[in-house]
């Protein structure tokens, strides 16, 4: 079996594989899904409204190992997701990033930078880390409610649907 064939199967303990298998729930449910890609909210704790994750529907750890069809489908998914997020939240900027250090399954963070926040991805990441740390210490100021997550997911889902149909 080749490395790529082995990565087509879910990997036990992989957060993304667990979500795709329905073993972990995303707040607000599936926002968008096609043959290759899945869009949903980040899993708990959610401290950043509109923080989405685009993940490949099979386990794969390197962009170089995407099939031509997966690679071709990625651009449109990222584009419509960013457009929908921008339409719903009106952020100053929408960032797309992929690190793969903690969760190696190919995934992309979609992070809206709110108006008034200093420009630069480093400020967004610092703000995100501080919010998560304080939430884990019991400060619930930034915790996004289930109702807000469901409402936001519905609005983003609707915007993506309109863009994919039109």
Where are these regions (language model features)?
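HIT superfamily nucleotide-processing domains
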Residues: 1-166
């Amino acid at each position: 079996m080749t490395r790529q064939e082995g990565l087509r199967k879910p990997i036990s303990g992989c957060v993304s594989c667990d979500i795709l298998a329905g073993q972990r729930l995303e707040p607000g449910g599936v926002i968008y899904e096609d043959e290759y890609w899945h869009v949903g909210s980040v899993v708990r704790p959610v401290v950043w409204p509109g923080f989405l994750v685009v993940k490949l529907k099979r386990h794969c750890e390197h962009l170089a190992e995407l099939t031509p069809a997966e690679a071709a489908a990625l651009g449109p998914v990222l584009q419509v997701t960013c457009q929908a997020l921008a339409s719903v939240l009106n952020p100053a900027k929408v960032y797309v990033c992929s690190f793969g250090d903690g969760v190696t399954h190919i995934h992309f963070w979609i992070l809206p930078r709110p108006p008034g926040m200093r420009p630069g991805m480093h400020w967004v990441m610092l703000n995100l880390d501080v919010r998560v740390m304080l939430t884990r210490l019991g400060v619930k100021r930034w915790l996004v409610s289930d109702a807000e997550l469901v409402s936001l997911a519905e609005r983003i889902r609707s915007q993506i649907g309109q863009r994919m149909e039109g």
